[in-house]
A protein has these predicted regions:
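ALDH superfamily catalytic-core signature
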Residues: 36-167
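Solvent-exposed polar/charged
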Residues: 4, 24, 45-49
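A structured beta-alpha segment of the ubiquitous adenosine-cofactor-binding alpha/beta core
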Residues: 13-29
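Short loop/turn motifs at secondary-structure junctions
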Residues: 7, 27-28, 50, 93
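Single conserved hydrophobic/aromatic residue that forms the stacking wall/gate
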Residues: 1-12, 167-169
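Periplasmic-binding protein-like
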Residues: 30-34
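ATP-dependent adenylate-forming carboxylate-activation enzymes
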Residues: 6, 13-17, 67-70
Length: 169
């Protein structure tokens, strides 16, 4: 006998009224949110009225740390998997990399080499490893971030521009 729990995952953006209705519903048994602290506080207040179970991951800024005794090939493989899962649009996707000075060059070279091999394309194509971002707004934010960091002195080691063959609709 299998105990299968039904789950529904919804991505709700800019729709407070929908979230309020879902939280108030007797159908919803648990709320899980990944998002900002501001939105988390609002949802927690609404859920408190029903003493609703809530799990939150708020405002994550996950570091990826590589010490001097690390297996660099394994660390690079793990970094690629963590950073590019769902195009980095995951709350636990690393935003900062701290690499021991003695391992930095080797790690960076491996990371670039492995990133070059990732297939960018249509998210519906099973062979695609990097598909589209969730919204055009997010795409613009990332392009602005790249430009800002370059202006502040960052050096782009790979890419830095959207592939011309891909169009965001």
């Amino acid at each position: 006998h299998l105990n299968v729990r039904r789950q529904r995952q919804m991505c709700i953006r800019d729709r407070p009224s929908i979230a309020q209705q879902l939280i108030a519903s007797d159908i919803v048994k648990k709320i899980s949110i990944t998002g900002s602290s501001r939105v988390g506080k609002l949802i927690l207040k609404q859920a408190a009225d029903k003493v609703q179970r809530v799990t939150m991951e708020l405002s994550g800024h996950s570091p990826f740390i590589v010490f001097d005794d690390a297996d660099i090939k394994k660390a690079a493989d793990m970094a690629i998997a963590a950073k590019f899962r769902n195009n980095g649009q995951v709350c636990i996707s690393p935003n900062r990399f701290y690499i021991h000075e003695r391992k930095k060059d080797e790690f960076v070279n491996l990371f670039i080499e492995k990133t070059k091999k990732l297939k960018i394309g249509d998210g519906m194509d099973p062979s695609t490893q990097l598909g589209p971002l969730t919204t055009k707004k997010r795409l613009n934010e990332i392009e602005e971030l790249v430009e800002k960091t370059k202006e502040e002195g960052a050096k782009v080691l790979l890419g830095g521009k959207r592939p011309l063959s891909l169009i965001h609709i």
